[in-house]
Each structure stands twice: as C-alpha cells, then as structure tokens.
UniProtKB/Swiss-Prot annotation:
Subcellular location: Nucleus
Gene: abaA
Highest taxon of source: Eukaryota
GO molecular function: DNA-binding transcription factor activity, RNA polymerase II-specific; RNA polymerase II cis-regulatory region sequence-specific DNA binding
Described purpose of this protein according to its UniProt entry: BrlA, abaA and wetA are pivotal regulators of conidiophore development and conidium maturation. They act individually and together to regulate their own expression and that of numerous other sporulation-specific genes. Binds to the sequence 5'-CATTCY-3', where Y is a pyrimidine, making both major- and minor-groove contacts. Controls expression of wetA.
Name of this protein: Conidiophore development regulator abaA
Feature: DNA-binding region: 130-204
Induction details: Expression is controlled by brlA.
Stated family: Belongs to the TEC1 family.
Disruption phenotype: Forms aberrant phialides.
InterPro entries xrefs: TEA/ATTS_dom, TEA/ATTS_sf, TEC1_TEAD_TF
One Pfam short name: TEA
Region spans: Disordered: 1-22, 213-232
Length: 785
C-alpha cells in the first residue's frame, strides 16, 4: 500500500548566469561591477539566447531596440531549435515595444551612486534588521529601492488611485519592493530611507530628479498620464511575466559592496503564485505555524516541555512548497465538501488564499503519564498591506469555522469567534477537544498492535479518509465599510482564507511533519473547473452517500466487529492516579499565546441536515437515514432542540484518557444524572477501535491531560464530565446540584448545554430534559483546557 511521502519546503533556486546566453565566461564580470562594458559588448553581438536581458536595454540605451528590418530566416534549412529561438526573439521584441515609452524610454545616469558619501554609506555594516530577520536595506533591497525610484516618478502630495484605494509614492515604492523581492518594507521605512539618502545626496541633479518634482511637472498640476511606470507590466499574464524581467538589476561600477549573487528573484514565484489573486486580494497568508504535541505533567504547556510530538510544520514557514492547482488534488470535491459548495457559488466568488496542509501524524505507542496535556497551536500570518496599516485595523469580528469529514461525511462542525487580534497574526483553534478524543482511541490501538496486526492498517486507512476544512472570515471595520466595500450586504463578512487538511500516519521510523502549499484557483479561472450540474426538477436530499449504502454494503473501515477481531484484555488494571490539578493562568496567556483554551462554540444550527451518527457509521443500515435535526437528546419529539453529540467510547479497560485543563474554566461539584446523548458510536468503537467498556467525553481547546484509568464502569452518579459551553445557541439551563466528591466539572453559565452519554447504561436513557450530564468512568474524567 502506497504511503504518503512528505515534501521538503525549499524555495525554488534561481538559475545562475552560466546558462544565460552565449557568454558563460562573463559571469564574474557580471557580478563584480563590470556590467557597463559587458552590456556594451553584448549590444553589438547576436541577440539570440539573451532574451531575458532585452528589457534591460530599454533603460540602458537612449533608443529603442530596433525591430529587424531584414527578412527573418525561413524555416527551410534551419534547425528546429533555431526556429524556436527566432520566434521567441521576435515575440520578445514585439512585447517590449508594446509596453510603450514608460519602460523603453531613455534612462538617465545616476551619478549619485558614485559619490563618495553614498559609497561610504553602503560600505557600512548593516546592523538594523527588519521583522523578517534580514537587514532592512540589504543589497537586494537597495537594488529594488533604486529601481522603484525610477519606476515611480515623484508625485508631490498627489495620490495614485487603484482598486478603490489611494496610494502615495512611498506606498507605491513599498509595493514595488515587495512585488520584486517578496520582502515587505513599510511606507515609513521607505520614507526614512529616503530621508537618510537625501541628507548627503541633496543637490545632486540625478538625485533631485528622482525625489522631487521638476518645475515642468509641477506647473501642470496633474499627475503623469501614465502613472507609475511599472504597474502595467506587472499585470501581464503569469507565464509571460515570469519569463521576462522588465526591470534591470541595479549594478554599478565603483560600488564598494559586493552585490548579492544572481539577479533579483522573479516576483511572486514563491510568495504570490497568482497575479490575479494579488490584484483582487491584498491580504495574503505570508507565513504559517502549526504544532501538535503532548507536554509532561507539572510542566508548562508550551511545546518546549513536550515529550511527544505528533507533528510539526516542516522547513521555513515563509517558504512553502510549490503551489498546486485545485483540480490536481484527487477527489477534492468529495474530500472537501465545504470547498465544493463555496466554489459552486457563482454569486460569491472565491477571492482568498486556499492553503493545503498535509499532516503526517506520529502516534504514541503507550499512554502518557496522568496529567499530561495535549497542545495544538495554529497560527496564520497575514501580510501587511502596502500602506503599512495593520490588518486588524482593517478587519474585525474574526471567526473560524471548522468542518471535519470521514469519507466525505461531516462528522464534526464548529464555529468559534476569535479574540481581537493585536497584529497580523491570526490564531484559529483546531479543535483539540476532538483530537484528544481521537488520540486516546488511536493510542490504544497502537498499544495493541502486537495482539492485533490489523489495527495498524485500520488506523492508516482511517487517516486516509480523514479530511478537514477551516474557513477564516472577518468583517471590515466600520470606518472602512463605507469607502472600501460600497456594495456590502447585510452579511458583510469577508472570507479571508480557507485551509484544507489531509492526514496520514507516519511509519515507525519517521517523525511527524506537516507541509503547506498554496492552492491556485483564481476567480478568473473558475470556468476551467467543472461545476456541479444544475438541479433540474424537484430538490431531493443528496443520495451520493446514503443511497448506495442502503442498496449494498459499502466498503468501510468501520466494519461490524468479528469474533476474531475483538481483542480481549485480561491484564490487571493500572494503579490509580490522582486527578489533574486545576490549571494555572501561566500555562497559556489568552492575550499573548494561542487562544485555544476557551470554550468551543458549537451551535445547534451548524449541524443542520446531518445524518444521525449511527446511520453514518453503520456499514449495514436497515432504516432510512435521518436527515432532520433531532429535537431532543434522547430522540423524543418534546422539548427544545438540543445538539446531538456522539460519544466516542474507549475500548481498553486500562485506558488513560486525556485531561483538558482550561484557562478560564473553574471547578465545581458535578451534577445529578439526567438526559444524555445516546451512544451512537458503538459501531466505530467495536469495529475499528475494539470492544467498548468506557467513554471519553468532549475536551476543550489546546490542552488535554490524561487522568486515571479504571477497569470497570461505575454507576451513573459516580463520575461526571461537563461539556464546555456552546455559544450562539440558547439552551435550557442546567441545575448545579451537589453530588459525590472526587469528580471533575466545569462551571458553566446559565445558557450552557451539558450533554453526555454512558454506553450500555440503562438507567440514563429517557431522562427528562433540563437534567443532562456527560458521564465518564471513575477517576478517568476529562479536564477541560
């Protein structure tokens, strides 16, 4: 069976000068300041093979490169490669002339670059560093800065309007630098750099021409008709834009500092693979961080104290793997149903980043000590717009919707509001409550591999069918809605990013790694992606998954348990451990760390038209699947609608469950038993995860300590675990009554929903509404984080 291999996230290397043109022996001259004589020599030689340098001549020579007036050689008698070169050469000249005088006009010399003060300034060691850890004005950025001065003529106090926004000259220079190098420099940094250079270059005619308006331009009172000279060239198609450099690399003789090797990297090769998306969506995901680990008890909850690492983002976070087209992802429509519905919505075109994350998870071979915590931190870094204004000043009301699928079936859905961001970094939760439950079950399977070799294959098959989609949305701030979003409707939230998750299990000798890459699916190319066929007739419930399962048994990893598949555990129970103590606020700061410790927001309305869990997991259903929302937790028709949450029971009698320690949670007495969610996961537990004698309940965000295991199930009142509160949905309040000691519970508000189940307990079903609990085995409760 083929295993999914991880890919290294190395940035594409730039081609060297050795393979450019028929002059490989001039490499050292080109990188050591002799570009003047080198270009003069090349100007009188055959241009074949030097197509990448034609755009440089527009700035170098006072006249346009003449179009050959003599007849071009015919294809008769020429080598095919020569024919291709001739055609390509003619096309380049035609494109170069089509750009007009903005780029091919005469370029004056810049004598200030040879001044003694400028040479001494550039010879200084670069001590100041930017947010990216590199010198603020390295040689590469200085080259781009000098090019930007040429490409953006002085405009005084006037503004350049584009895409409904106004840009000053410094903002245009900052955007030019970013598009050319992929490195962000703010408007204030550009302004400061101009002031530093102006302090010792003021008075130089060439410098004055680049930084101050000429009297002739000022007398007109209008900006140049062509605007910034580089804007049109960057709007060329993607392929032609990268194959022709329209901006000369800044080199000059007498330059004291050795220039960086190679030319300026082609813009957007790594950072922005799609120019159309850049033009319609300024806020891009520039970096990403993701870790999933288990930290030791009585240790800080950070990854520094982790003793097991499930997975971690591999390589440079700001240099993802090469982009991938959406149609090249196998079965993306069934693997990511939410994305499929978004792509099919013609009234709301997709204009945000799509990120594909492929996570290799390394499972644990045994349970961790009692009190261990599961940590998951996910962080997105949105780039700063060219005007230097922070992204959070433009957007507010950030939210994250998470959809988890097994074989295309939605098994989990949650929406959470994100705290107010203080920077461009957004920290969406990744449902550690759900993962803690899964890891507990999968850890038990890994522990029993010697007894059941089929368990390893079942676990791997399970991860292959597991996918997730996360949608990040935000609302434009009130002071910007009127002028930037004039056509906003009642729901004026904007889709900021979509994350696609695929999972695999590592081999025994591998470490868990995660890669991420952009998925290219621009709005302009949506017609190339086949959309679902329009509905013709009466709308019926979808039959793609349910009808086939009713007609014949579908292959699934959740098979009915067989006698030879069940693993019986005859070992003695492990010793009892004390419950995990209430967490301290120092574990994670909600304002500074990853805010994954708050309660889950899981509105009931988010699970509309969801088939009952028993119908989804049962391989041989006998009844018509339910498509209506249950109105109560025990299946009755009375009472207000409650959220039905399946309980994932544990099958190992010696199982240590995750404890979840929460930042804002408190501890109180548990409740009396009441209405609970029916145990709808027995097929899953008995099929892939073995026989079930215990249950593990919902867990909160970010942390999950393992508590005490037991070998028997106590009665209903012996131990309880309360779910975290669900926002955006009002449910009947639950009474807080005293109960037996030595149990764990989270104090919830008056509108919180407490749900739970005890598999196989006859005394729990049929209880009245308003008295709900989530039972768990004695001394094996789950602490919420």
């Amino acid at each position: 069976m083929a295993e999914w291999q991880t890919e290294c996230m190395l940035p594409p290397t730039q081609p060297g000068f050795e393979g450019v043109g028929p002059h490989p022996g001039r490499v050292l001259q080109n990188t050591s300041g002799n570009i003047q004589s080198y270009s003069d020599t090349l100007a009188h030689t055959d241009p074949t093979g030097r197509d990448d340098h034609f755009s440089h001549y527009g700035f170098k020579y006072p006249h346009q490169p003449p179009v050959p007036t003599h007849p071009m050689p015919t294809t008769t008698g020429l080598h095919p490669q020569q024919v291709i070169n001739n055609r390509f050469h003619t096309k380049k000249l035609r494109r170069l002339q089509s750009l007009g005088p903005n780029l091919i006009g005469p370029r004056r010399t810049r004598s200030y670059l040879k001044s003694q003060k400028y040479i001494e300034y550039r010879a200084r060691p670069r001590r100041d560093t930017g947010k990216d850890g590199e010198p603020v004005w390295s040689d590469e950025l200085e080259d781009a800065f000098q090019q930007a001065l040429e490409a953006n003529p002085p405009m005084g106090r006037r503004k350049w309007s584009e895409r409904g926004k106004s840009y000053g000259r410094n903002e245009l220079i900052a955007e030019y630098i970013y598009k050319t190098t992929g490195k962000r420099r703010s408007r204030k940094q550009v302004s400061s750099h101009l002031q530093v250079l102006d302090s010792f270059l003021k008075g130089d005619p060439d410098w004055e021409r680049l930084v101050r308006e000429q009297p002739a331009d000022r007398s007109n009172g209008q900006p140049p008709s062509a605007g910034p000279r580089w804007r049109n060239s960057l709007e060329l198609p993607f392929s032609s834009h990268y194959n022709s450099h329209n901006y000369p690399s800044y080199h000059d003789s007498l330059r004291p500092v050795q220039s960086y090797s190679g030319e300026l990297p082609p813009p957007h090769v790594v950072f922005h693979p799609n120019l159309h998306a850049e033009a319609t969506n300024i806020n891009k995901i520039y970096g990403l961080s993701f870790d999933m680990w288990v930290s030791a008890p009585n240790q800080p909850g950070g990854i520094e104290s982790a003793f097991h690492l499930y997975t971690r983002l591999q390589g440079d976070q700001r240099h993802p793997a090469p982009p991938k087209r959406l149609e090249n992802i196998p079965n993306w429509r069934t693997s990511f149903p939410h994305l499929n519905s978004v792509m099919a919505d013609v009234n709301n075109p997709l204009n945000c980043d799509i990120i594909l994350l492929e996570a290799n998870l390394r499972l644990m071979d045994d349970f961790p000590p009692s009190g261990s915590k599961l940590g998951i931190q996910l962080e997105l870094d949105f780039t700063q717009p060219p005007n230097g204004d922070a992204l959070t000043n433009q957007m507010e009301n950030w939210s994250c919707s998470t959809y988890i699928y097994e074989e295309g079936q939605n098994i989990y859905r949650a929406r959470q509001d994100l705290p107010k961001q203080q920077s461009n970094k957004v920290k969406p939760p990744f449902e550690s409550t759900w993962w803690a439950k899964r890891f507990t079950e999968l850890t038990e399977i890994a522990k029993d591999r010697q007894l059941n070799e089929l368990a390893d294959r079942q676990t791997r098959d399970y991860f292959r069918t597991l996918t997730a989609v996360q949608e990040i949305r935000a609302t434009p701030s009130s002071r910007r809605v009127s002028n930037q979003y004039p056509d906003n409707s009642q729901d004026d939230s904007k889709r900021m990013a979509i994350l696609l998750w695929q999972f695999r299990q590592t081999r025994s000798n591998e470490v868990g790694t995660t890669t991420w890459r952009r998925v290219t699916s621009p709005s302009s190319d949506r017609n190339t992606i086949p959309s679902p066929k329009p509905v013709t007739g009466i709308d019926l419930p979808p039959l793609s998954f349910y009808a086939n399962s009713l007609a014949r048994p579908a292959p699934s990893i959740y098979q009915a348990p067989q006698s030879h598949d069940l693993v019986h555990h005859n070992g003695t129970s492990q010793p009892q451990w004390s419950m995990y103590q209430p967490p301290q606020d120092s574990i994670f700061n909600a304002n500074g760390g990853f805010d994954l410790l708050n309660s889950i927001t899981k509105p009931e309305g988010g699970l509309h038209d969801k088939t009952a869990v028993t119908s989804v997991l049962d391989t041989y259903p006998n009844l018509q699947p339910e498509v209506s929302q249950p109105t109560s937790l025990n299946g009755s028709n009375g009472g207000p609608g409650m959220l039905s949450i399946p309980d994932m029971s544990l099958s190992h009698t010696n199982l240590n469950a995750y404890n979840l320690s929460g930042h804002d949670n408190h501890y109180g007495t548990p409740q009396h038993p009441g209405v609970s969610v029916p145990d709808n996961s027995h097929v899953l537990n008995n099929g892939i995860f073995g026989s079930s004698t215990q249950s593990i309940d919902d867990m909160s965000q970010t942390h999950a300590p393992w508590p005490t295991p037991t070998s028997s199930i106590t009665d209903v009142g012996s131990s309880n675990y309360s779910h975290l509160q669900f926002s955006d949905h009002h449910v009947p309040s639950v009474s807080r009554e005293s109960h037996q000691p030595n149990h764990f519970e989270v104090l919830l508000g008056p509108d919180d929903l407490i749900v739970g189940s005890m598999p196989g307990d006859p005394g729990i079903n049929g209880a009245a509404h308003g008295h709900m609990n989530h039972t768990y085995t004695e001394n094996n409760a789950v602490e919420a984080a």
